[in-house]
């Protein structure tokens, strides 16, 4: 029997506000435990929440960027459950009346563009954090994170493979980063994803029983966890078993999911409107004000890069996947007006450098201005492309302009045709057998001759001049 996967994602994005959603405590990451707290986020009797307007602005930006309809009237609700990191005994969230609904994203798949629906976006507060002692039966509670603002983005169950889910998730991540409302750090938990996965016989309309997968802290782990769960459920159904509705945790080391608890339904949380918060009313003027603040988003920028710079699809996708990378590329093109040459270096040498060091482009030791200066040296014939790679490596630790590095290390290209011609003649005189073989039809020996000349000049001879003079002499 052939099975089809049905996947929906719930994404929690921690918003980059300086203060929490319902109080003035700092949201800064990494502070000493329980130092960014107050009576409101600790749930002390008599303390009252006050909504942070910046949180609403940020939620509206995400709603507009994902084609959602913003509700003119929404309301906060209490989600009731007990856990040690939830001091009030409930979480303030939104339930029946979220801030935004009915959006979508268009994602790239192997079959072309696919529309993934977004059911809703709602605002809520984060819970605290538990750490467990590995040597003693002790758990510690840090409530610094309690009350940190989140938006939850709930997709429709429109994805059919781990790769579609990953593509959707990466696009959401990019949009949040472009909007500058979330730093997207999955390891620190500011961008978290839960996956609802079920399987059904291909062609069947009715959904199967779903399992919710948690604890996936990278795009790769999201793919692996969903792939495992699809395989687990398919095997179970094929063998006559029954899928249980439950929450499962992903174990990246063992490459499997395992049962955590039975999956709760909405009624288990006893949602009801929060009596301490008035309903949120949003008028058209506010929506248009926020719309005017939206930047160029990833898909729009990618389309512009394809048209304006004539880039290949894969290159445009890579360059626009992060706002900082796209900014770096355009800053370089602004100075050195050869978009494809800049693209080759950014997607090649620069990307390799960033990967090797495990850093982002904002931390690159080579600025866009210095890279543009290096490319200008190649264009002006001061150095060859091969020497440029050596200079690029030097620029990782040397903060000077590339021109100064080239001069100090004596890397200026030999372009004098008379000087190169004498070297060409020396090489040909020293290799009579190879010359005869070349003239006898072994044209691949041209690479051998070029290599010999480059060896004599330590790679500094102008390759175009070398090739031209060699052809003239060998084809006589």
UniProtKB/Swiss-Prot annotation:
SMART domains xref list: GatB_Yqey
Coiled-coil stretches noted in the UniProt entry, renumbered to this chain: none
Keywords for this protein: ATP-binding, Ligase, Nucleotide-binding, Protein biosynthesis
Reactions that this protein is recorded to catalyse: L-glutamyl-tRNA(Gln) + L-glutamine + ATP + H2O = L-glutaminyl-tRNA(Gln) + L-glutamate + ADP + phosphate + H(+); L-aspartyl-tRNA(Asn) + L-glutamine + ATP + H2O = L-asparaginyl-tRNA(Asn) + L-glutamate + ADP + phosphate + 2 H(+)
InterPro entries associated with the record: Asn/Gln-tRNA_amidoTrfase_suB/E, Asn/Gln-tRNA_Trfase_suB/E_cat, Asn/Gln_amidotransferase, Asn/Gln_tRNA_amidoTrase-B-like, GatB, GatB_C_1, GatB_Yqey_C_2, Gln-tRNA_amidoTrfase_suB_CS
Enzyme Commission number(s) of this protein: 6.3.5.-
Gene3D superfamilies: 1.10.10.410, GatB domain, N-terminal subdomain
A Pfam family assignment: GatB_N
GO annotation terms (biological process): glutaminyl-tRNAGln biosynthesis via transamidation; translation
Top-rank taxon: Bacteria
GO molecular function: asparaginyl-tRNA synthase (glutamine-hydrolyzing) activity; ATP binding; glutaminyl-tRNA synthase (glutamine-hydrolyzing) activity
Top-tier EC class: ligase
Functional note: Allows the formation of correctly charged Asn-tRNA(Asn) or Gln-tRNA(Gln) through the transamidation of misacylated Asp-tRNA(Asn) or Glu-tRNA(Gln) in organisms which lack either or both of asparaginyl-tRNA or glutaminyl-tRNA synthetases. The reaction takes place in the presence of glutamine and ATP through an activated phospho-Asp-tRNA(Asn) or phospho-Glu-tRNA(Gln).
Family (UniProt): Belongs to the GatB/GatE family. GatB subfamily.
Xref: HAMAP family: GatB
Quaternary structure, from the entry: Heterotrimer of A, B and C subunits.
Protein name per its UniProtKB record: Aspartyl/glutamyl-tRNA(Asn/Gln) amidotransferase subunit B
Species of provenance: Desulfatibacillum aliphaticivorans
The gene coding this protein: gatB
């Amino acid at each position: 029997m052939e099975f089809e996967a049905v996947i929906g994602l719930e994404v929690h994005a921690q918003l980059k506000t300086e203060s929490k959603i319902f109080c003035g405590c700092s949201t800064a990451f990494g502070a000493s435990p329980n130092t960014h707290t107050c009576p409101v986020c600790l749930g002390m009797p008599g303390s009252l929440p006050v909504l942070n307007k910046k949180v609403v602005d940020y939620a509206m930006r995400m709603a507009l960027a994902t084609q959602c309809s913003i509700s003119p009237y929404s309301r906060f609700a209490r989600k009731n459950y007990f856990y040690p990191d939830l001091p009030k005994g409930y979480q303030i969230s939104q339930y029946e009346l979220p801030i935004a609904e009915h959006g979508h994203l268009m994602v790239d798949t192997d079959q072309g563009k696919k529309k993934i629906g977004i059911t809703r976006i709602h605002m809520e507060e984060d819970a605290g954090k538990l750490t467990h002692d590995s040597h003693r039966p002790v758990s510690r509670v840090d409530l610094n994170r309690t009350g940190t603002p989140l938006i939850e983005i709930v997709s429709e169950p429109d994805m059919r493979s781990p790769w579609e889910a990953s593509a959707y998730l990466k696009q959401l991540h990019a949009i949040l980063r472009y909007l500058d409302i979330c730093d997207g750090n999955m390891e620190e938990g500011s961008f978290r994803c839960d996956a609802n996965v079920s399987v059904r016989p291909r062609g069947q309309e009715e959904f199967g029983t779903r399992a919710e997968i948690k604890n996936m802290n990278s795009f790769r782990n999201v793919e692996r966890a969903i792939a495992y769960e699809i395989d687990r459920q398919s095997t179970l159904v094929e063998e006559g078993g029954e899928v249980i509705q439950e929450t499962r945790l992903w174990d990246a080391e063992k490459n499997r999911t395992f049962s955590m608890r039975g999956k709760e339904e909405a009624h288990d949380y006893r949602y009801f409107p929060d009596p301490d918060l008035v309903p949120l009313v949003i008028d058209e003027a506010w929506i248009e004000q926020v719309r005017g603040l939206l930047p160029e988003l990833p898909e729009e920028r990618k389309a512009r890069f394809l048209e304006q710079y004539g880039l290949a699809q894969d290159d445009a996708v890579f360059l626009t996947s992060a706002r900082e990378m796209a900014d770096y590329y355009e800053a370089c093109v602004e100075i050195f007006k050869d978009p494809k040459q800049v693209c080759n270096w950014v997607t090649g040498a620069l990307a390799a450098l960033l990967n090797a060091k495990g850093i982002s482009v904002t931390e690159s030791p080579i600025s866009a201005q210095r890279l543009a200066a290096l490319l200008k040296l190649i264009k002006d014939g001061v150095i060859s492309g091969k020497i440029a790679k050596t200079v690029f490596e030097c620029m990782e630790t040397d903060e000077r302009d590339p021109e100064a590095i080239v001069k100090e290390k004596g890397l200026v290209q030999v372009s004098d045709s008379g000087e190169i011609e004498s070297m060409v003649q020396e090489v040909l005189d020293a290799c009579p057998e190879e010359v005869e073989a070349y003239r006898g039809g072994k044209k691949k020996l041209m690479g051998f001759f070029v290599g010999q000349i480059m060896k004599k000049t330590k790679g500094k001879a102008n390759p175009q001049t070398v090739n031209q003079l060699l052809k003239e002499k060998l084809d006589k």
